């Protein structure tokens, strides 16, 4: 996508955010954002994982659309962590994570590499923080069982980054869905964009793109099918 098209879709400021998130110059991005980043009136947020999505989406919208304050950021990649911290005026913890670092925050956003989502979530729940877990919440059943146990033990809130049901197009479709007793079939054809052979998504230990991305569409399918009076007895997933 060229810059001109990006500006049409996202606007100038968000496009600038995406560019900075890719090249990561030492740029005090917070100076041009609308939000007063030194505010202490809102939620205090910790950010785990400082990749492009965290930089151009999570940190951006927390800084422009809420009164939250990003207190700290950490990533195993020192450049990713330091560049996001510099851009958004947060404390850079680098990869030296200690559970005590969560004592100053209300909620932690977890958008690190996929295999680490579960353990980070468990650690912060046990520390008494609400957590927002980007998809996937777990990469295998063992992790899911551990996370489920931690959620049941904790009285803190857990949010999950399956956002497709909240898209404007799905809301339009739902408004047009009148009769919930009529049977219907839902089919999704998904074509993933190209990623290089050495991309970390392809590492089997990270859950692969099936766990990482297909979960979005399974979640959306269940949501749409729930509009009917009964849920289906099974889902059939074909990987070609």
Which residues does each predicted region cover?
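Conserved small/polar residues in nucleotide/adenosyl-binding loops
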Residues: 1-6
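N-terminal Rossmann-like dinucleotide-binding module
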Residues: 7-88
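Short, well-ordered alpha-helical microsegments
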Residues: 55, 81, 117-118, 140-141, ...
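Acidic (Asp/Glu)-rich catalytic clusters
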Residues: 62-63, 126, 149-154
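Conserved acidic residues
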Residues: 71, 106, 184
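Beta-loop-alpha module in the N-terminal Rossmann-like domain of NAD(P)-dependent dehydrogenases
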Residues: 88-132, 136-147
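A contiguous active-site-proximal alpha/beta segment in oxidoreductase catalytic domains
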Residues: 138-198
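Rossmann-like dinucleotide-binding domain that binds NAD(P)(H)
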Residues: 197-240
């Amino acid at each position: 996508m060229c810059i001109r098209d990006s500006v049409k879709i996202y606007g100038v400021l968000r496009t600038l955010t995406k560019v900075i998130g890719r090249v990561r110059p030492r740029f005090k991005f917070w100076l041009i954002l609308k939000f007063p980043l030194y505010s202490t009136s809102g939620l205090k947020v910790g950010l785990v994982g400082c990749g492009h999505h965290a930089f151009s989406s999570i940190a951006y919208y927390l800084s422009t659309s809420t009164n939250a304050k990003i207190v700290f950021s950490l990533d195993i990649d020192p450049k990713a962590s330091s560049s996001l911290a510099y851009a958004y005026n947060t404390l850079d913890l680098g990869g030296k994570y200690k559970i005590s670092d969560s004592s100053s925050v209300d909620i932690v956003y977890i958008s690190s590499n996929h295999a680490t989502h579960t353990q980070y979530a468990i650690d912060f729940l046990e520390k008494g923080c609400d957590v927002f877990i980007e998809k996937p919440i777990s990469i295998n059943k063992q992790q899911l069982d551990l996370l489920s146990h931690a959620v049941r033990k904790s009285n803190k809130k857990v949010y999950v980054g399956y956002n497709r049901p909240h898209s404007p197009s799905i809301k339009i479709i739902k408004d047009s869905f009148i009769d919930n007793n009529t049977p219907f079939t839902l089919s999704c054809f998904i074509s993933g964009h190209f990623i290089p052979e050495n991309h970390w998504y392809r590492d089997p230990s990270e859950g692969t793109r099936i766990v990482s991305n297909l979960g979005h569409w399974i979640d959306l399918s269940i949501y749409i099918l729930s509009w009917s009076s009964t849920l289906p007895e099974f889902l059939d997933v074909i990987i070609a």
